[in-house]
Regions:
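Cytosolic, long alpha-helical scaffolding segments
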Residues: 1-120
């Protein structure tokens, strides 16, 4: 989905300002940390550390909180004409897609957690 949004953005001639790019980069960083946490859990399935699982859930909450903050700020920025409405739409599509990646990551961690608890 992300490549589709980027292609549509480019085809429509929509431009992002530096703030939007910075926020997208920030969200990518959060998701990257989440992937790292998931990989850490996956790397030691025989001895899953509960602290690593908890850290994954904390990262997911951070992703959700950032998404909520960016969504609220997006409405304010569009209303304040800080950037165009269409820019805000594509921006939020990208942020939502990245947040969904966080959801997929936590689904993997949920499965590992459930297996870990069933073995105890």
């Amino acid at each position: 989905a992300l490549p589709i949004f980027l292609l549509r953005k480019q085809e429509s001639g929509v431009h992002f300002n530096d703030e939007i790019y910075s926020n997208i980069d920030l969200m990518f960083g959060y998701v990257e940390k989440s992937v790292g946490g998931m990989l850490k859990v996956l790397s030691n399935l025989e001895n899953v550390d509960e602290h690593d699982i908890i850290a994954c859930y904390n990262r997911e909450r951070e992703i959700n909180n950032l998404r909520n903050q960016l969504r609220t700020a997006n409405v304010v920025n569009i209303n304040g004409r800080h950037y165009e409405y269409q820019s805000g739409i594509y921006y939020m599509d990208i942020i939502s897609t990245l947040e969904k990646a966080g959801d997929f990551i936590i689904n993997v961690v949920d499965t590992i957690r459930d297996e870990f608890r069933n073995k105890k």
